[in-house]
Amino acid sequence: MIDRVLAGRYKIVSSLGEGGMARVWRAQDLNTGKYVAVKVLREEYHDDEVFVHRFEREAQAASRMTHPNIVNLLDVGVEPDGTRYLVIEFVSGKTLKQFIQESGALRPDIAAQIIIRVLAAVQHAHQNGVIHRDIKPQNILIDKEGTVKVSDFGIARVANAQTTSQDTETVMGSVYYFSPEQAKGATVDEKSDLYSVGAVFYEMLTGQVPFTGETPVAIAMKHLQQPPVPPSRINPAVSPALDYVVLHALEKKPRNRYASAADMLRDVRLALEHPDTI
C-alpha cells in the first residue's frame, strides 16, 4: 500500500496500525498537503457481506457527526479493485490507555477534564442517533495539544435499530468496559455507553479497571453481579462527589444510571466545584 494513491488524492505514507477488520494508514492529502488517516478494509473481506456491512455502518455513523471531540470522517470511497476506505482525521498523540499505562492513576481533576470531553462527544453522538457501543481508553485519543477525541465507531449502531451486543465483533480489551446488558447480549441503548464511560473514568481515577478475571466470561459475570469497589478506597484523592458520579454511572440496571450524557456531564462539573457534596 505504501505510495499508493487512493481517489487520485490520498497518498499512503506509512502504517499506523491494524485491527481484525481493517488496516489504518497515514496518508497525505495531495490537494491540501495535510496528513490524514485512511482506514482500509482488509482485502480478504472485500466480498464478505458481514464485514462490508460493518464498514459501511461505521461510515454511516461517522457521517452523522462533526464534533471537536470526535475523530471526524473526511471522505469515503471504493476503488475499482474493490478497496474500501474511510478517510478520517489524523491525530498525532497517544491513546488514553497508553497514558494510564505510563502514569497509573491520573490526578482526579485531570481525569474529570478528560471525561468531560468524552461525555461531550458521547452526547453529540447520542443526539445524532448513534450509540458507540465500544467506549474504552484504547478508543480515546489525546493529541499533542491535549485535545481529547473519541474514535472507532466501527461497531456503532443507529439508535433506532435493533441494537444488541451479540455480534462477535468485540475484542478481549472491550470486556473490561462492557455494560451488564452487553455482557449478557441484551438490547443496549445510550445508557450502555454511559456505563462504559463510567468504567473508563474509574480506570483513570484508580489506575485499574472496575473488574478483572481470567476469562471474558468471568469479567462479564462481575459486571452483572458484583458491585465495584468505590474509587476512593483505591485512591483516597478521589472526592465523595466523584465517587458518586462513577458509581452512579456503573449501576447494574440501566434505569438506575444517568438518564443522559448531559446529566452525567453536569454532575462531573458540579463534582469539580463542590468535591465534598453528593
Describe each region flagged by the PLM.
Residues 118-130:
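Protein kinase catalytic-loop region centered on the HRD/HxD motif
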Residues 174-277:
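C-terminal lobe helix-coil module of Hanks-type protein kinase domains
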